[in-house]
Amino acid sequence: MRAVFGEKGDFESWIELVKLVSGNFPGLDLKCYKDVLIEKIEKKETLVVKEGEKVVGALAFSYEEKELSFLAVHPEYRQENIGTELVKKFASLFEVGTKLSVITYRDGDIKGKGARKLYKKAGFSEGDLITVFDYPCQEFIYIVK
């Protein structure tokens, strides 16, 4: 399975994945998320990994902000390097030397254990401790090689 740009036809399957993992995203407003997702698909700021027509991995990002804003892998497909494939594809869209960022959970938060491991494996380094939606988080940084 490989990461490709998301398309309008992936919308419903993507939303099903979001509903499945929504507990891991504090402050997620599904109505607002749907509106933003449509816009991101149109701007080619989404990547998916699919099994048939089913979205099993999804990544949203911003070219302008140089930020990975959403990453999820279907629970039944974890440990298959789907997250790694998505992150590698994301980084490949930017020029060498570009500073990319992602916000994830802080060290010690069980919700962020898998994400932090993935980002570190992909070459991200720990950045500032921040608070998002009244939840303690941490920024991770990656310099495109």
What are these model-derived regions, one by one?
Residues 1-16:
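A short beta-loop-alpha structural element at the N-terminal edge
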Residues 25-46:
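Active-site rim helix/loop that mediates acceptor-substrate recognition in acyltransferases
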Residues 48, 54-62, 67-72:
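Conserved beta-strand in the GNAT
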Residues 74, 78, 105:
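Residue-level recognition of the GNAT/N-acetyltransferase active site
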Residues 77, 81-90:
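Conserved acetyl-CoA pyrophosphate-binding loop and the N-cap/start of the following alpha-helix
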Residues 84, 107-128:
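Conserved active-site alpha-helix within GNAT-family acetyltransferase domains
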Residues 94-108:
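Conserved GNAT acetyl-CoA-binding A-motif
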